[in-house]
């Protein structure tokens, strides 16, 4: 797979794309109670964080996600506006290269 450093999504575009994917697939992968909780609380306590891919992804994908091209987006709820996300609804490994719309999601169990 040829990836181009000059054809990457920005961090904001990556967060937006990951969140759009989350919204599209959440109803098929999350418990209805979790969907309701997330919907009711997102404006107050919700968030999405962009991180380099963690080593944990090596257990779930058959390649090493290069941080130049892949990001991990965590979507969930925090205890307060200033706190870190502690109730994770999805971890999304997403390719930032625009011509390779690759992603993998680990859903809340």
Swiss-Prot record:
<dbReference type="InterPro" id="IPR036763">
    <property type="entry name" value="Put_dsDNA_mimic_sf"/>
</dbReference>
<dbReference type="Pfam" id="PF04269">
    <property type="entry name" value="DUF440"/>
</dbReference>
<comment type="function">
    <text>May act as a double-stranded DNA (dsDNA) mimic. Probably regulates the activity of a dsDNA-binding protein.</text>
</comment>
<protein>
    <recommendedName>
        <fullName>Putative double-stranded DNA mimic protein plu2488</fullName>
    </recommendedName>
</protein>
<comment type="similarity">
    <text>Belongs to the putative dsDNA mimic protein family.</text>
</comment>
<dbReference type="InterPro" id="IPR007376">
    <property type="entry name" value="dsDNA_mimic_put"/>
</dbReference>
């Amino acid at each position: 797979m040829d990836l181009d450093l000059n054809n990457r999504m920005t961090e904001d575009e990556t967060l937006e794309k990951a969140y759009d994917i989350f919204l599209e697939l959440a109803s098929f992968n999350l418990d209805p109670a979790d969907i309701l909780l997330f919907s009711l609380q997102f404006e107050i306590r919700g968030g999405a964080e962009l991180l380099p891919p963690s080593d944990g992804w090596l257990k779930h994908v058959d390649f090493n996600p290069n941080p130049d091209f892949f990001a991990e987006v965590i979507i969930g709820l925090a205890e307060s506006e200033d706190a870190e996300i502690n109730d994770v609804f999805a971890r999304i490994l997403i390719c930032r290269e625009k011509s390779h719309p690759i992603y993998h999601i680990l859903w809340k169990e």
